């Protein structure tokens, strides 16, 4: 049976392992991370945001080889720093590249050896064969042509449904967005040098304006977006759950009730399980563990004119994104 391997056990990699171990434990045949076995096991067992996993996890060594025991399954763990050097077994037909280091096609393609025919990068890529945010553009995927695939970013997965639903219901004339985004490990805990001088500042002391890779990914996936679409990311001193704020001028008149109805219809129909609806008076911590790509806070919907609107959507930037990553790779393994 064709299976998948995963390189990189950071925030997204570890959550993907949890999800796959619960959904499809038969799919995961190998892992790679430079960290020692005891550290990998500790971080899989204990998570400051998401708590302990729902299955037993342990580490063991046999004949000099490290293994992770995930429930009833034993999965080999390698520690190679270079994708070309990872001895993934012949069962691995697809590699999830989740290290965050190999986002360019040429680097990720170093996995394409032996039985491995496809790679999915768990981050935006400037030159992957295809960037996928299903169902916005998943139908375009051609396994013969697209061998190195990007799963875009958490912000892109949250924003794409908001844009598509507005566009289908009312048409988009102009659109921009901002994301209130949690701290990531590409910031400094204390003031230290960084090429982005704002990110050089202590992450838990300030609101830090910066750029977002989501804009490039969204333009790749939705090439008909209005010219000039862009925005800003505001990094805030929290650990989980982002808020996307989309502002748009529409091609047709809309009121608050009509906008809310469009998102309610989408959440119960074509976007079921990908778009959720928030309970009243929610705050960010209420959305930890939500697996949807975005959870619309319709109480915050505003109209600033008959065609000038603001809509807001929350997303667990870790759980939601890891869930979409697992959706994609599970589908691909079944088709390769």
Predicted regions: what they are:
Residues 1-200, 327, 335:
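N-terminal Rossmann-like NAD(P) cofactor-binding subdomain of oxidoreductases
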Residues 6, 10, 14, 101-105, ...:
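Electropositive phosphate-/nucleotide-binding environments in soluble metabolic enzymes
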Residues 15, 19, 110, 161-165, ...:
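Alpha-helical scaffold segments in soluble metabolic enzymes
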Residues 34-37, 125-126, 153-155, 179-186, ...:
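Glycine-rich beta-alpha junction loops
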Residues 130, 205, 244:
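Small-molecule pocket liners
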Residues 141-143, 199, 236-242, 303-306:
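Short, flexible turn/loop "capping" segments at secondary-structure junctions
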Residues 168-239:
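Acidic, glycine-rich segments within the central catalytic cores of soluble metabolic enzymes
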Residues 231, 243, 247-336:
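C-terminal active-site/capping subdomain that shapes the small-molecule cofactor and substrate pocket
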């Amino acid at each position: 049976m064709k299976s998948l391997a995963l390189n990189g056990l950071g925030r997204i990699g570890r959550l993907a392992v949890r999800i796959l171990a619960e959904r499809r434990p038969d799919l995961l045949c190998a892992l790679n991370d430079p960290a020692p076995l005891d550290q990998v096991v500790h971080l899989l067992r204990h998570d400051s945001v998401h708590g302990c996993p729902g299955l037993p996890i342990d580490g063991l060594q046999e004949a000099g080889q490290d293994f992770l025991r995930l429930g009833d399954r034993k999965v080999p763990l390698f520690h190679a720093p270079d994708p070309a050097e990872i001895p993934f077994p012949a069962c691995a037909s697809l590699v999830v590249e989740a290290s965050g280091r190999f986002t360019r096609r040429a680097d990720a393609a170093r996995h394409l050896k032996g039985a491995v025919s496809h790679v999915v990068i768990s981050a935006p890529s400037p030159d992957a064969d295809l960037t996928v945010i299903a169902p916005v553009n998943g139908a375009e995927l051609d396994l013969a042509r697209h061998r190195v695939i990007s799963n875009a970013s958490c912000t892109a997965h949250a924003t794409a449904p908001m844009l598509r639903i507005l566009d289908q219901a009312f048409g988009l004339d102009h659109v921009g967005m901002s994301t209130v985004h949690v701290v990531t490990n590409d910031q400094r805990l204390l003031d230290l040098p960084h090429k982005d001088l704002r990110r050089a500042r202590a992450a838990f002391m300030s609101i830090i304006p910066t750029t977002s890779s989501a804009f490039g990914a969204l333009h790749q996936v939705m090439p008909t977006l209005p010219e000039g679409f862009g925005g800003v990311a505001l990094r805030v001193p929290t650990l989980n759950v982002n808020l996307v704020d989309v502002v748009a001028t529409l091609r047709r008149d809309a009121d608050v009730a009509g906008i809310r109805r469009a998102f309610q219809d989408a959440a119960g129909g074509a976007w079921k399980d990908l778009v959720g609806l928030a309970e009243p008076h929610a705050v960010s911590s209420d959305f930890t563990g939500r697996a949807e790509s975005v959870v619309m806070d319709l109480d915050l919907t505003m109209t600033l004119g008959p065609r000038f609107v603001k809509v807001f959507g929350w997303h667990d930037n870790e759980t939601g994104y890891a869930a979409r990553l697992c959706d994609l790779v599970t589908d691909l393994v079944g088709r390769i």
